[in-house]
């Protein structure tokens, strides 16, 4: 009887361990904290002169990922520890604001890129040299784009890079439900995700500026480069 009981207990323990991954994902998806952290916000990230961070929440998301990845070989921590990690997600607005900012900024960059690409450099600087019109464009670039837009884009990059890496790591946890995988792929997957679309839009926009200013010899280091002043 004793060996039979031992075998039954071993089988029961193995059975419970086999369901840990499913239980983990069910609990994570059912939590409002997790859902709210990875959804669109009503407002984008604020424009701030000081650096905005989301370190505590990203660290909590990484820890939740480590817990899921270690299952079923390693048992999860107690409920209080899990609740503390979820609370860190709940206390952060940055992820949802970042998601909204990525969508809005990508759209804005795409529109601005189309305008730049539609500008005929032959009319802007007929002699392939700085002209009065190209100097106006350079003024816009230095005062508006480099002075106001680029700092915000840098803020998105600083906040978004560790966030995207954390989302990608969570996506790799085994036994992820299809719906959850799709949602995370849409946020930071390799193709057609918010993060990748933003990166592509930023690259194209930067290239559009370089092409247009370069055609008028107005890039940094070229003869037409100067630092305009307001007014």
What are the roles of these predicted feature ranges?
Residues 92-231:
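A cross-kingdom marker for long, charged
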